[in-house]
């Protein structure tokens, strides 16, 4: 079943975040499809950050494999230092029953 990595946060250090993007994009490329990269998300409930990212993976296992890989774990600290008010999750897609 298709799965999605959904992240929402505020970028507090653009230069550091660009460094993270440059290093993380090749890691996430294998089987992933970037669906959303919005720098001006409009929050309607709660206190969401301004940036939202949605990445599609073929399965939840594939998404977890990328997130938990040594390569991604080596750069995740850069993202965490560049953002605040962050949250992220990996969720299964939904198939409407027929």
Predicted segments, located by residue:
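Short S/T/G/P-rich N-terminal loop/turn motif that feeds into the first structured element of a domain
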Residues: 1-52, 57-68, 92-98
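C-terminal structural segments of small proteins and small subunits
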Residues: 64-66, 71-91
């Amino acid at each position: 079943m298709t799965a999605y990595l959904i992240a929402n946060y505020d970028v507090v250090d653009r230069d550091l975040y660009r460094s993270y993007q440059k290093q993380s994009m090749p890691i996430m490329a294998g089987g992933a499809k970037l669906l959303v990269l919005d720098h001006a998300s409009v929050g309607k409930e709660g206190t969401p950050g301004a940036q939202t990212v949605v990445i599609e993976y073929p399965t939840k296992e594939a998404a977890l494999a990328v997130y938990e890989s040594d390569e991604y774990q080596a750069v995740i600290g850069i993202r965490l230092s560049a953002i605040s008010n962050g949250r992220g999750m990996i969720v299964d897609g939904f198939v409407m029953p027929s």
